[in-house]
Structures are given as structure tokens and as C-alpha cells.
């Protein structure tokens, strides 16, 4: 039995618990339980619309109760780049965000959310969508991601993103709806 398996077993017991006044009970039963799918996830698009850390944590707690094990965090979109960049702070400048200007997650908040997910046995997978859905990048740099200049910037930027999420085994890069 793994720590994660024990955690999911507790969630099953929580789901079976009935409350009658101040008393809690579980009907006698036999449980055979395992996931139908290895990855049971949820994607939250904060690139288009910023969501507070408090709300994200509430969502992760609910996901965990229902044994969802992946939280896909879509951080960049045409509307905004929501992850703080120390090397390219213009990405987080209000004038480069077309929706909810000035709203982004600090590096410390991103690391905090990774830790919070781990505590709830949920894997956080950050996404930096590229090269499509990148109008916020273009507004900040005046270069398309696919240009020579854009690729040089992206290399540095992705190094920074990987440092922020060094405890996470995956980084999603989108790659949908690319225009050539």
C-alpha cells in the first residue's frame, strides 16, 4: 500500500460516510476500488481569466476528494501571460494583458500551488501555450514566437519556467492552433 493509495482509500471512506445529527457512520460494506483511468484530470484556464489562489486551492481540494489526480494549469493565452517572469517583466505588465490586467501569479505562488497539490496527491501540470494562443507574448515583445527573435526569447523564458516548476515532472506546451 502506497501513501497515495492510502490517501485515495480515505477519500472513498469519506464518500461513504453518512451524517445523522452529530454522529457519523458508514454502512457495512465490502469495497473493491481502483481507478478506471491512470490520469484523472481537470484543466483550469487562468490565461483567459485570472482565478485567485484561494479559489484554485478550493478546486484542488474538491478534485482530491473525488480522486482526480491531475491539475492542468493553463497559464498563458492570447489575453495574458499569468506567470511572473523576473527576466521579462514586460510579460506581466498590465498594458500587455487584454483581460483582467495586472493579474498574474508570482513565482512564490506557483511554487506554493505545486506544494499544495502534492499535499493533496494531485499532480500539477503547468502549461505555457505555444506557438499558438500567444498574442500576449507578441504584445510584450513585438515578435512572434516562431520568429528568430521570438525563439531566442522563448529559450530563456522556458529555462525560467522550468526553474519555477523544477519539482514537477511535466511541462505542457500546448501546440494547438498554430498558424504558419
Where are these regions (language model features)?
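Feature activates predominantly on carbohydrate-active enzymes
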Residues: 1-172, 179
Amino acid at each position: 500500500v502506497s501513501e497515495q493509495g492510502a490517501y485515495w482509500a480515505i477519500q472513498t471512506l469519506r464518500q461513504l460516510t453518512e451524517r445523522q445529527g452529530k454522529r457519523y457512520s458508514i454502512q457495512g460494506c465490502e469495497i473493491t476500488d481502483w481507478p478506471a483511468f491512470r490520469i484523472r484530470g481537470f484543466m483550469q484556464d487562468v490565461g483567459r481569466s485570472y482565478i485567485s489562489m484561494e479559489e484554485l486551492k478550493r478546486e484542488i481540494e474538491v478534485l482530491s476528494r473525488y480522486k482526480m489526480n491531475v491539475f492542468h494549469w493553463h497559464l498563458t493565452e492570447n489575453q495574458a501571460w499569468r506567470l511572473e517572469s523576473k527576466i521579462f517583466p514586460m510579460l506581466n505588465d498590465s498594458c500587455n494583458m487584454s483581460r483582467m490586467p495586472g493579474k498574474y501569479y508570482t513565482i512564490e505562488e506557483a511554487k506554493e500551488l505545486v506544494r499544495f497539490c502534492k499535499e493533496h496527491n494531485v499532480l500539477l501540470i503547468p502549461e505555457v501555450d505555444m506557438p499558438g494562443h500567444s498574442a500576449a507574448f507578441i504584445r510584450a515583445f513585438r515578435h512572434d514566437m516562431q520568429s528568430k527573435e521570438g525563439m531566442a526569447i522563448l529559450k530563456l523564458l522556458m529555462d525560467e519556467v522550468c526553474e519555477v516548476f523544477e519539482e514537477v515532472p511535466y511541462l505542457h506546451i500546448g501546440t494547438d492552433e498554430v498558424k504558419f
